[in-house]
């Protein structure tokens, strides 16, 4: 289980994470400057402002049929977005788009060569300002978008650079970047993780560097248009790939675009240091940033190398509140069968350095179970679970070990309790899918079981007893 400072789980009623919970390489948004409103994938009650312009009429008169042009901001201003996935619906109205494939009044598609949508039909006449038209990423049943407004008003904040991230198994991963539309809207990120939390970052080093951000945005758009060759040509011409941090930013973007191999290439470039920097030690902060990306890319050999260096330096400083890197590395390595011996060594190093804690006992128990020592692994995970029953990773690993060892009734009891306590997260999601456990979140996104579960989990909860497990 991860050290408490680095847990990835969230409750079932999760909202936009606080700035304090975001990765250190992102600065929090200034509350005195901006406000962000989260848009969820609900078919009704859309509240975002429009983002398209009509092309069917010379003057924008109300009409029941029209086509819109997806206009996106970039470093040079607004421009049509050809061959780009989009999402469009009638904003804040009792009316809806007719004949959509899903019947929910929301139309998904890809713009044509001029950036236009398909023809849209509605029951009532509308102007272009009655629609919300935004770029779309992904094609899952769950989704999010944001709208930026100036602090203290409903005035939108257009052309503002942003990055959206989502917690994954091994860290906070970029899922999109770009500029807000003229109505302050981000793209719509569509995914298949039930109740997955998405964060918006608008005040970071990468968003403040306008020239470099524009280069990343251009590459992102090419990949969104399914133009991999065009994206690679832009990467080859980029100027912002000189520093290690710029290379890591590009690697994060490439991972978001589904280009993991190319992302690994740029991650490895950060380890090729030019003369005379090659003779200087890598700064701890830079190594930590590199370690974050190595974890996201699933590179256990590099994670182990960088973690060991940081642990050695950490032991010299003896910081009482330092992250337990040995435990976190052990938990990461447990996902790679060939690295289980190193994982166990790291887990035992954690217990030796900081003493037995619920989280590192849970980590060692999980690793021992994976190495065939199921009884001892379950004993340690039981101790961890009694102290941290609402930790989604402990609930996932302990329950999954019980289930794999044939104790399926006990695993079901544990997960029933987690469901009652509204425990949820990406790891628990994967474990329940493997076991075929019938969780409410495995129903359609706007179904009655999902809505009822969300409503219940939004209420105050009382900690349940766990002694029987």
What are the roles of these predicted feature ranges?
Residues 241-243, 275, 320, 355, ...:
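Short coil turns that delineate tetratricopeptide repeat
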Residues 323-387:
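Alpha-helical adaptor scaffolds
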């Amino acid at each position: 289980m991860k050290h408490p400072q680095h847990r990835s789980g969230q409750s079932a009623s999760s909202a936009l994470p606080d700035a304090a919970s975001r990765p250190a390489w992102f600065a929090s948004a200034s509350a005195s400057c901006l406000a962000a409103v989260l848009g969820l994938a609900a078919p009704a009650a859309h509240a975002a402002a429009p983002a398209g312009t009509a092309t069917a009429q010379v003057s924008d008169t109300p009409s029941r049929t029209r086509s819109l042009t997806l206009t996106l901001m970039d470093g040079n201003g607004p421009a049509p977005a050809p061959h780009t996935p989009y999402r469009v619906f009638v904003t804040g109205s009792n009316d809806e788009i007719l004949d959509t494939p899903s019947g929910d009044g929301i139309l998904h598609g890809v713009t044509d060569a001029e950036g236009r949508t398909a023809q849209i039909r509605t029951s009532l006449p509308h102007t272009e300002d009655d629609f919300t038209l935004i770029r779309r990423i992904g094609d899952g049943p769950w989704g999010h978008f944001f709208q930026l407004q100036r602090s203290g008003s409903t005035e939108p904040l257009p052309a503002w650079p942003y990055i959206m991230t989502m917690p994954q198994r091994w860290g906070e991963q970029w899922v999109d970047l770009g500029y807000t539309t003229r109505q302050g809207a981000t793209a719509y990120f569509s995914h298949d993780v039930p109740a997955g939390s998405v964060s918006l970052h608008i005040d970071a080093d990468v968003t403040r560097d306008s020239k470099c951000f524009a280069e990343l945005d251009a590459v992102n758009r090419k990949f969104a248009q399914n133009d991999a060759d065009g994206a690679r040509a832009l990467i080859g011409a980029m100027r912002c790939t000189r520093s290690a941090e710029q290379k890591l930013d590009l690697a994060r973007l490439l991972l978001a675009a589904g280009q993991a191999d190319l992302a690994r290439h740029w991650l490895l470039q950060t380890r090729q240091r030019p003369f005379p920097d090659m003779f200087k030690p890598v700064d701890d902060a830079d190594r930590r940033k590199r370690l974050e990306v190595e974890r996201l890319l699933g590179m256990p050999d590099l994670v182990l190398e960088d973690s060991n260096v940081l642990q050695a330096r950490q032991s010299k400083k003896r910081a009482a509140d330092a992250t337990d890197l040995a435990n976190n590395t052990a938990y990461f390595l447990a996902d790679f069968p060939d690295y289980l011996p190193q994982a166990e060594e790291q887990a035992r190093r954690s217990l030796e350095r900081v003493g037995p804690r619920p989280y590192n006992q849970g980590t060692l128990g999980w690793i021992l179970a994976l190495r065939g020592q199921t009884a001892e692994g379950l004993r340690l995970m039981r101790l961890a679970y009694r102290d941290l029953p609402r930790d989604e990773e402990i609930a996932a690993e302990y329950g999954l070990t019980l289930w794999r060892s044939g104790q399926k009734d006990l695993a079901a009891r544990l997960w029933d309790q987690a469901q009652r306590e509204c425990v949820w997260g990406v790891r628990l999601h994967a474990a329940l899918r493997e076991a075929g456990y019938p969780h409410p979140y495995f129903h359609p996104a706007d179904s009655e079981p999902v809505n009822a579960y969300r409503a219940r989990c939004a209420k105050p909860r009382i900690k349940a007893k766990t002694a029987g497990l």
